[in-house]
Curated annotation (Swiss-Prot):
Keywords: Secreted, Signal. It is found in: Secreted. Residues 1-20 form the signal peptide. It comes from the Eukaryota. One of its GO terms (cellular component) is extracellular region. This is Small venom protein 1. Expressed by the venom gland.
């Protein structure tokens, strides 16, 4: 029974982490990291002010 409780806590932790708000890449992130972020979260490009994604935006739109 104790194992089941621990298992449920671990599963809940993973779910909560996945639902947490996505953070913008750090200012020191490489262009490749920023581009990966742009492809995964295109709706956050303007919010995060990612300059390295400007070419990507033109290709997508």
């Amino acid at each position: 029974m104790r194992c089941v409780a621990i298992f449920l806590v671990v599963i809940c932790a993973f779910v909560l982490q996945a639902l947490a708000e996505v953070q913008c890449p750090a200012s020191g992130a490489s262009d490749q990291d920023n581009l990966d972020f742009c492809m995964e979260y295109p709706e956050l490009i303007e919010k995060c002010e990612l300059k390295s994604c400007e070419g990507f935006i033109k290709v997508v739109s």
